[in-house]
From Swiss-Prot:
GO molecular function, one term: zinc ion binding
Purpose: Component of the acetyl coenzyme A carboxylase (ACC) complex. Biotin carboxylase (BC) catalyzes the carboxylation of biotin on its carrier protein (BCCP) and then the CO(2) group is transferred by the transcarboxylase to acetyl-CoA to form malonyl-CoA.
Protein's UniProt keywords contain Metal-binding: yes
Major location (coarse): cytoplasm
Keywords: ATP-binding, Cytoplasm, Fatty acid biosynthesis, Fatty acid metabolism, Lipid biosynthesis, Lipid metabolism, Metal-binding, Nucleotide-binding, Transferase, Zinc, Zinc-finger
Name listed for the protein in its UniProt record: Acetyl-coenzyme A carboxylase carboxyl transferase subunit beta
Gene: accD
Cofactor details (free text): Binds 1 zinc ion per subunit.
Native source species: Xanthomonas campestris pv. campestris (strain B100)
Cofactor: Zn(2+)
Positions contributing to Zn(2+) binding: C32, C35, C51, C54
Zinc finger C4-type: from-to: 32-54
Region (Disordered): 1-20
Length: 295
């Protein structure tokens, strides 16, 4: 205590006296990973995790994405929600696969990386699936493949379009060949949809790589990407190390892919619901739907 503090009355706080720290609720403020702006959490969530300052598309959870797609007045039903991963191979790297599963389930709150639902989009039936990158990097294992296949089967039974939002690092190495088999399994499921004349729209988000990009993610009747999403089989650093050349600026980003004919269009996440509704009604030759939000 300084001599000045001794002379000051006890009721008076000096400038150097530490004030009580105010606890800020977790998630109240977030920082944009692109422009660095401080963003108010609830407003960012309402804006579908898109920065209002620079329009940068940040990561969004699968359930939030699907909730923004389906009609509010007709709650969707989840498909194959009870399925969970099994460590058939008893795989172990630095950590046991079984332990990784439990850790991911605890941190993400999901059983696996793909959520599939059946619901309504502006009054018309729709089946949609979305990857949750928070679960082991959105990697594709047996459960992801099975949920995708079952979602396609539901779309086939109902006779409605199928939409999938991809965000994945690729096949899950801890499941070995069981994971790689899902590439053929999901592609075959889409083949049955195509034979029935039902549309499949693939939405590629950041990032869509590996076995997912090499299978159902690029098999859409229409392939849509979110702005500046990384899309490709191997990442740019791996390619540069392999070919020993500097890649073009923006290589493997959605804008580059659109310019080179690899995808059909780019759509802002906030406009995605309307865009998908327009495309599905056109492809199904349905009358233009009434906007359920405006009703």
């Amino acid at each position: 205590m300084s001599w000045l503090s001794k002379l000051m009355p006890s009721g008076i706080r000096t400038e150097n006296t530490p004030a009580k720290k105010r606890s800020v609720p977790e998630g109240l403020w977030e920082k944009c990973s692109n422009c660095g702006s401080a963003l108010y959490g609830p407003e960012l969530e309402e804006n579908l995790e898109v920065c209002p300052k620079c329009d940068h598309h940040m990561a969004i959870r699968a359930r939030a994405r699907l909730a923004a797609l389906f009609d509010v007045d007709s709650p969707p039903t989840e498909i194959a929600a009870q399925l969970g991963p099994v460590d058939v191979l008893k795989f172990k790297d630095q950590k046991k696969y079984g332990e990784r599963i439990k850790a991911s389930q605890k941190s993400s709150g999901e059983y696996d990386a793909l959520i599939a639902m059946r619901g309504m989009l502006k009054g018309n039936p729709l089946v949609a699936a979305a990857f949750d990158f928070a679960f082991m990097g959105g990697s594709m294992g047996s459960v992801v493949g099975e949920r995708f296949a079952r979602a396609a089967e539901v779309a086939l039974e109902v006779g409605c379009p199928f939409v999938c939002f991809s965000a994945s690092g690729g096949a899950r190495m801890q499941e070995g060949l069981f994971s790689l088999m899902q590439m053929a399994k999901t592609s075959a499921a889409l083949g049955r949809l195509r034979e029935a004349g039902l549309p499949y729209i693939s939405v590629l988000t950041h990032p869509t790589t590996g076995g997912v990009s090499a299978s159902f993610a690029m098999l859409g009747d229409i392939n849509i990407a979110e702005p500046h999403a990384l899309i490709g089989f191997a990442g740019p650093r791996v390619i540069e190390q392999t070919v020993r050349e500097t890649l073009p600026e923006g290589f493997q980003r959605s804008e580059f892919l659109l310019d080179h004919g690899a995808i059909d269009q780019i759509c802002d996440r906030r406009d995605m619901r309307d865009r998908i509704a327009e495309l599905t009604t056109m492809m199904m030759r349905q009358p233009h739907p009434q906007d359920a939000d405006a009703a």
